[in-house]
């Protein structure tokens, strides 16, 4: 059987009791090592705590050699460990589909992930819309599909969780072209880079989806003892020093609940100024929606 086991967000002890008991009985244990990291535990720490040797599963192994992971799973117990919750990435869904095709049974042992723990900032989970991912921009590649999803969310008053890029065991274009098996150092997108990239796309698209005054929340090292939450404008967060990874960014919707505001202001340097930002943002967004509506009527 294939066991997909969530590890939680930070510490080796974040694993559930059922997850730990399952690991101990497995013949092989894989640790997925490219969609996220445990902030307070290295591979060796996990091995000592679990009493098991871990096999690192990078992107290439999971996406191109999944049959190697699943080998023998018809007869033996195989564990696949994922930081956060097992179904936080589509890659893990693909692994389950392949297991089904091979007639392999599987079970999932869930755990906390950024998708639910983000409520620690005070925003109500059912007030979130589509989650988006933000990748590192290059000089020639600046994908902006996230922009339209943020727009859709804000039009109906919903917040947007922005998941920030992680580069682990990535190769440069030069090394790929030369066939050199050399990998770049790990990179983790910071809050300030994420906010700057969002504003860069707004400047180029100019559809007034958000601006430097749009209220946002920086969530750093969620679930760890060094967790930090910062409330401010996108412009302020573009100059924020967010520190060590991991980070997520939230763009607020234009209809923030009073209870959410009461919770959020505790994370702002100037609570009254942050409240004013929220009020101003709601008013400005409604004006933009009205203008766009009139423009659509004229086109007809």
From Swiss-Prot:
Gene3D superfamilies: Cobalt-precorrin-4 Transmethylase, Domain 1 (3.40.1010.10), Methyltransferase, Cobalt-precorrin-4 Transmethylase, Domain 2 (3.30.950.10). Signal peptide: none annotated. Coiled coil: none annotated. GO terms for molecular function: diphthine methyl ester synthase activity. Its EC number is 2.1.1.314. It catalyses: 2-[(3S)-amino-3-carboxypropyl]-L-histidyl-[translation elongation factor 2] + 4 S-adenosyl-L-methionine = diphthine methyl ester-[translation elongation factor 2] + 4 S-adenosyl-L-homocysteine + 3 H(+). GO terms for biological process: methylation; protein histidyl modification to diphthamide. It holds the Pfam family TP_methylase. S-adenosyl-L-methionine binds at residues 9, 85, 88, 113-114, 164, 222, 247. It is found in: Cytoplasm. Belongs to the diphthine synthase family. S-adenosyl-L-methionine-dependent methyltransferase that catalyzes four methylations of the modified target histidine residue in translation elongation factor 2 (EF-2), to form an intermediate called diphthine methyl ester. The four successive methylation reactions represent the second step of diphthamide biosynthesis. This is Diphthine methyl ester synthase. It comes from Yarrowia lipolytica (strain CLIB 122 / E 150). The lineage of its organism: Eukaryota, Fungi, Dikarya, Ascomycota, Saccharomycotina.
């Amino acid at each position: 059987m294939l066991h997909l086991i969530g590890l939680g967000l930070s510490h080796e002890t974040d694993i559930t009791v059922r997850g730990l008991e399952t690991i101990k009985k497995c013949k092989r244990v894989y640790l997925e090592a490219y969609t996220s990291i445990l902030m307070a535990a290295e591979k060796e720490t996990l091995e000592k705590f679990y009493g098991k040797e871990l096999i690192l599963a990078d992107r290439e192994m999971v996406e191109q050699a999944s049959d190697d992971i699943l080998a023998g799973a018809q007869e033996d117990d195989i564990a696949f460990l994922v930081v956060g919750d097992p179904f936080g990435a589509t890659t893990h869904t693909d692994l389950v589909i392949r297991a089904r095709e091979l007639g392999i049974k599987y079970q999932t042992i869930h755990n906390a992930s950024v998708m639910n723990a983000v409520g620690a900032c005070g925003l109500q989970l059912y007030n979130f819309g589509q989650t988006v991912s933000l990748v590192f921009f290059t000089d020639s590649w600046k994908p902006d599909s996230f922009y339209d999803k943020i727009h859709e969310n804000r039009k109906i008053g919903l917040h947007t969780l922005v998941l920030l890029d992680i580069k682990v065991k990535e190769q440069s274009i030069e090394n790929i072209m030369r066939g050199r098996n050399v990998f770049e150092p790990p990179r983790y997108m910071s809050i300030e880079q994420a906010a700057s990239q969002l504003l860069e796309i707004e400047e180029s698209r100019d559809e007034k989806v958000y601006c430097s005054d749009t209220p946002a929340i920086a969530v750093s090292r969620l679930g760890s003892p060094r967790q930090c939450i910062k409330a401010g404008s996108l412009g302020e967060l573009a100059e924020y020093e967010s520190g060590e990874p991991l980070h997520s960014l939230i763009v607020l919707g234009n209809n923030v609940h009073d209870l959410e505001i009461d919770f959020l202001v505790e994370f702002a340097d100037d609570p009254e100024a942050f409240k004013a930002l929220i009020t101003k943002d709601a008013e400005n967004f409604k004006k933009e929606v009205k203008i766009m509506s009139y423009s659509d009527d004229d086109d007809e």
